[in-house]
Amino acid sequence: MQPPLFVISVYLLWLKYCDSAPTWKETDATDGNLKSLPEVGEADVEGEVKKALIGIKQMKIMMERREEEHAKLMKALKKCKEEKQEAQKLMNEVQERLEEEEKLCQASSIGSWDGCRPCLESNCIRFYTACQPGWSSVKSMMKQFLKKIYRFLSSQSEDVKDPPAIEQLTKEDLQVVHIENLFSQLAVDAKSLFNMSFYIFKQMQQEFDQAFQLYFMSDVDLMEPYPPALSKEITKKEELGQRWGIPNVFQLFHNFSLSVYGRVQQIIMKTLNAIEDSWEPHKELDQRGMTSEMLPEQNGEMCEEFVKNLSGCLKFRKRCQKCHNYLSEECPDVPELHIEFLEALKLVNVSNQQYDQIVQMTQYHLEDTIYLMEKMQEQFGWVSQLASHNPVTEDIFNSTKAVPKIHGGDSSKQDEIMVDSSSILPSSNFTVQNPPEEGAESSNVIYYMAAKVLQHLKGCFETW
């Protein structure tokens, strides 16, 4: 019985695989679909290339606009740098004059101050002792106050900050040069990408409609008949002048030169003579000492005013001959130059802040441009790679053939499309399976196959 069983088993297996093999009708349907693959595929390729060329055109337009914005930024940066250098130069000149005046004043003021200080200290301490008993505390306060006056007149103020270091300017210059180099290279890359895409356009120009040809070859300043690609990422920018509102530092120089000396004179007169003006009711005080009119119980308001402000001691300078006009005539230029130097330093700080802000805006503008360019190149740049392979759309879809394959007896899911890509790609051939839900005779298969082939080709170009 064993031989008959063996024969029956072989026969049943043969029938099974015979039933699963493709019929002539199904094979003819697959071959018929493949004959229409070049026509459908070429239409898809033309549409995808057209979309990519529109994206490349938009990228070129965007880059040209970005170049204009970058040029305005660099112009503003150059102007701000010149203004900053002028502010630095002005501050250096004031500092040199201040140092010269301090050296001259220091030599002459020491002797005069040594003669003025004892008399001024004596009168002031007597007054403050009468107003506020406590010799040690009053004497300590007086020494600190007089020491501040001497330090202000004989040496540079400790509050004056050093001018900005030259190394900082050099570092900023290097940063600007780096930004300029990156942006220039980005512009070159964008132009190169467009040139390669333009070569593809010339190859396929006859396949495109007249409106698209006019658009792609038109000047970028004309109206655009096609909506911009990546419209969500490219937003309208405000005018640079309205957006930043950079003040004119040269105008600040002019205003500074007109007002600083007037303010300095007012500050000096206020500091040295304000108390003297309020002293008119008490001119009857003589140089021999304090009278009963200055006692706390009779002049409480005056004592309270002087205790709150030790600069009231300067009122007694008229009691001493050597102190009479010391602060206003001995070294009049030193206080004025100190204030002028502080004003110049403030101007330098303002110009440095403006320069830093424009550098930051330029850096942000560069980073934003790089981001947009990368996004657009990622989406549309694949078309430029066709230029180095001399593609012909017919070759892509003519080099195809059906490969029958057995799939567990389901003849409607057996076919695959093999694409010979050696004519346009260095990679080996690849196959595309029929969609699971469609049979070989379905008309939807050809569109599915064409889309898969095009997707594969685009993926290969995008990785290069």
Curated annotation (Swiss-Prot):
Domain of life of the organism encoding this protein: Eukaryota
Coiled-coil spans in chain: 56-109
Alphabetically ordered keywords of this record: Coiled coil, Disulfide bond, Glycoprotein, Secreted, Signal
Keyword Hydrolase applies: no
Molecular function in Gene Ontology: misfolded protein binding
Disulfide bonds, paired cysteine numbers: C105-C331, C116-C323, C119-C320, C124-C313, C131-C303
Glycosylation positions in this chain: N195, N255, N309, N349, N398, N429
GO cellular component: extracellular space; nucleus
Name by which UniProt lists this protein: Clusterin-like protein 1
Organism from which the protein derives: Rattus norvegicus
Organism ancestry: Eukaryota, Metazoa, Chordata, Craniata, Vertebrata
